[in-house]
Structures are given as C-alpha cells and as structure tokens.
C-alpha cells in the first residue's frame, strides 16, 4: 500500500482520527503513523493525546506500516461510531 492509496481510502471511507505523517502535536484518540530514521511507527493516542502504552508497533517498511495504520484507523472509526 502507498501513501496515495491510504489517502484515497481515508477519503472514500470518510475515516477520521488519523495522523498520516503530519508534523504536529498528537490529538486525542487518534491513530498516528510516523517515520523516524527510516523506521516507521504506528500507535494510538488516548483521551489526553498521549501515546497509549503498548500500542506502538515498529516496521521496517513503509508499506507494512501503512497497512497496519489503515487497519487500525478503520477499527478506531468503528469504535467511535
């Protein structure tokens, strides 16, 4: 999966609560994907916008991280609705 494909899925499915490589502070109850030194991380935040302990997963490839991000973002949206 590519960033463009993820953006298309987010738009088509009207998914909310995702931080797709944005350089900003975390928001409450969102799924975050970030790249640090060619390693990709996906994690969830809580109601105080803090990283949820145990939620962070590290990936060696962007594709794996994006797959995980979109799966978890879909789940987050099911829980919110």
Can you describe what each PLM-predicted range is?
Residues 1-26:
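Negatively charged, low-complexity tracts enriched in Asp/Glu with abundant Ser/Thr
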Residues 4, 60-73:
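A short, charged, amphipathic alpha-helix used as a generic interaction element across diverse proteins
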Residues 18, 23, 39-41, 50, ...:
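Residues in flexible loops and secondary-structure boundaries
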Residues 27-54, 72:
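Short aromatic-glycine-(Arg/Gly/Cys) micro-motifs in beta-strand/loop hairpins
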Residues 32-36, 63, 81:
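Phox homology (PX) phosphoinositide-binding domain
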Residues 55-59:
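A structural signal for short, well-ordered beta-strand elements
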Residues 75-81:
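Intrinsically disordered, low-complexity charged/polar segments
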